[in-house]
Amino acid sequence: MKVSVLLGLQWGDEGKGKVVDVLTPKYDIVARFQGGPNAGHTLLFADRKYVLCSIPSGVFQGKVNIIGNGVVLDPILFKAETETLTSSCSNLVDKIYISRKAHLILPTHRLLDVAYETQKGNNKIGTTGKGIGPAYTDKVSRNGLRIGDIDYNFEEKYRYAIARHKELLHQMNFQYDLLPLEREWKKSIEVIKRFKRINSDNFINKALIGGRTVLAEGAQGTMLDVDFGSYPFVTSSNTICASACTGLGVAPAKIGDVFGIFKAYCTRVGSGPFPTELSDEIGEKLRNIGNEYGSITKRPRRCGWIDLVALRYAVMINGVTQLIMMKSDVLDTFDTVKACIAYEVNGQKMEDFPFEIGSSVKPIYTELVGWKTNMTKIKSENEFPKAFKDYLLFLEESLGVSIKIVSLGPDREQTIIRE
């Protein structure tokens, strides 16, 4: 068996949570391979909305859910997340496994995150302040604490890390009150101890050999990747397909289908370049119809037309085999729909994604006829209006990959799987 990978192709918030919920019946194991609690996957289950930050989205389907070694885990937020799930998901401790190699977000990581961002002044990158960046910094500098450390001289390692962080905070002259946060953090560690802490790399590889199916679930989006995104306005981890290998411990040869998710338009939260951003009534219309507000931060998302330059790049980097288009229904009322097919940079046409996106980058659009049809009740692709079929064909020809799934609303039933 091979691992299927599901990831976002834009700046995050593509709708991965719903798609995982749709796909999980086919899989035995769902595994998160990177990121932290700065991104939320929104799912509807039993008429209730849930936002999952660290727990894989297969939890509602009774699957084995693995938090992989590439994830950074905040015990406080993990505890809170499990508490919101107890009414809908029984026996959580039997469904969620945590990699011993996953790194912990310490209470001082949150403080450092805020302190670093404050120091940047006008050059802020829009961090969520959840401590993800400092946790990954400790990881690569070989100073981090891992889940497995809970069972080995943990208090000594913890005290050493906290003392080092306090010194950094002192150097930045940052005022803080650690005690309440630390007290809550230590209570939350006791909750983590109830869950199975495993060598997830061995577990997943043995599962594949045994014929079990695995879906690797990414967080955020390709254009936020620390290497291939719009640096420095990116997240602190690799969000692309290759990260499923390093974040779960599986070989590249064991990667199978790569499902790439994108919206029928574009959104972005926080600072950073966004070539197709619309700061007019059209952008506001997209935001209102699409309810474009961060699932965790509640920040209004910046909205714009679909960017095929960035999307082609994301498809290439990830080796996408099947595309999934979300929120098609948001465009139902538009007379015309635009798509960015290239950039103009200093008077020159550019079809490849550039090293840096500055103010000189201007989108070059093509305009398509809108379908002007309420598609939220459609049950089959045969019911798609012709203009929407033309839009799908245009996207497939532009991206070189077929669109397998089309989402027409937030509910699981509003999902069309194409032949």
From Swiss-Prot:
GO MF annotation terms: adenylosuccinate synthase activity; GTP binding; magnesium ion binding
Cofactor-binding details, from the entry: Binds 1 Mg(2+) ion per subunit.
Cofactor: Mg(2+)
A cellular component term, taken from the record's GO annotations: cytoplasm
Residue positions binding IMP: D13, E14, G15, K16, N38, A39, G40, H41, T128, R142, Q220, T235, R299
Enzyme's top EC category: ligase
Pathway listed: Purine metabolism; AMP biosynthesis via de novo pathway; AMP from IMP: step 1/2
Binding-site residues, GTP: 12-18, 40-42, 301, 327-329, 407-409
Cross-referenced SUPFAM superfamilies: P-loop containing nucleoside triphosphate hydrolases
Gene Ontology BP term (one): IMP metabolic process
Cellular localization per UniProt: Cytoplasm
Main location: cytoplasm
UniProt xrefs under SMART domains: Adenylsucc_synt
Keyword match Phosphoprotein: no
EC number: 6.3.4.4
Reactions this protein catalyses: IMP + L-aspartate + GTP = N(6)-(1,2-dicarboxyethyl)-AMP + GDP + phosphate + 2 H(+)
Function: Plays an important role in the de novo pathway of purine nucleotide biosynthesis. Catalyzes the first committed step in the biosynthesis of AMP from IMP.
HAMAP family membership: Adenylosucc_synth
Record note on quaternary structure: Homodimer.
Family: Belongs to the adenylosuccinate synthetase family.
Protein name in the entry: Adenylosuccinate synthetase
Gene transcribed to yield this protein: purA
